Amino acid sequence: MSPSFRSQARPTRQRRSVLQAGAALLAATLAGGAAAQAREVVIGYQDMVVPWRYAQETGELEKRTGYKVTYRKLGSGAEVVRALASGAIQIGEAGSSPFAAALSQGVPIEVFWILDDIHDAEALVARNGSGIGTLADLKGRKIGLPFVSTTHFHALVALQDAGVDPRAVQILNLRPPEILAAWERGDIDATFVWDPALAKVKQSGRVIATSGQIAARTGKATFDALAVSKSFAREHDAFLARFVQVLADADRAYTADKGGWTAASPQVQAVAKWTGAEAASVPASLALYAFVPPAEQAGPRWLGGGKASVVAQSLAATAAFLKEQGTVHSVLPDYSVGVNPAWVQRAQ
């Protein structure tokens, strides 16, 4: 509330805010209850190029669970987090940075599956002819990226590591489709993004740094994951166990036959359809990621290690950095409260 409002208006406005918040919470609770009774789920996904898009296309999750599954495409991790918080979706895909921010803000979610270890699948690209050849050259220039995303986090990390004050760079909050439009118009000098947008900007740009290089240099790694609303998870244990098995089988099928995932294959055609990528670029895009097998995810290094796990430590480091930047106001003492290995530990 603005301090210019008169004090006598505050009780009424505060009560209205409380009532509105209560109504929103009740609506989300009722929505969750309705989903529980009807065996329905809404899954928010993004445009990451990952193997399980083929399972989305074939309806594999529906076949194995008997649930009605609705997929809702969202434009950024921040949108996914807001949808989880409101109850509009029960499960969502996002990067480690949005989930770190969500947990720091008290959103009741649990990370339960690592979609990918990002490695070189996200990159900072400068436009050809921009005169940008190093991170130092970004001073005073415009970078387009989605705020509170893994690329936002790594852009800030990379700039600081290079001795560049992020405030000396114009960082614009753009979702991938908006990045492509701004790139085509010449409104931005650089972008930090993932495929399919990454493949398109590479055609007229130069890679300055990848997430894998930044992680190797700074020790701050990033990943994409799936998280579930805690209230939904309590009521749908068997569904989540089968969902994780679908995810594991999708990754295994790709890893065992990478050569078969050609541009003309039904698998790659499905990935292209669900993400908006060009089929010809999908095989190379998939190769940039590392897909972590369920046995490794279940172990102490990833989801199963409690506070000392890679996931909890990465979430904590990301949240601490976001707090320094003013993106979040507080950090949790232990981010393993937002990590649940139970379902991946039962996967085969």
Q: What positions do the PLM features span?
A:
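Short, glycine-/small- and polar/acidic-enriched structural segments
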Residues: 37-178, 189-195, 211-212
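Pocket-lining segment of extracytoplasmic ligand-binding domains
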Residues: 178-276
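Helix N-cap/coil-helix junction residues
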Residues: 107, 164, 277, 327-328
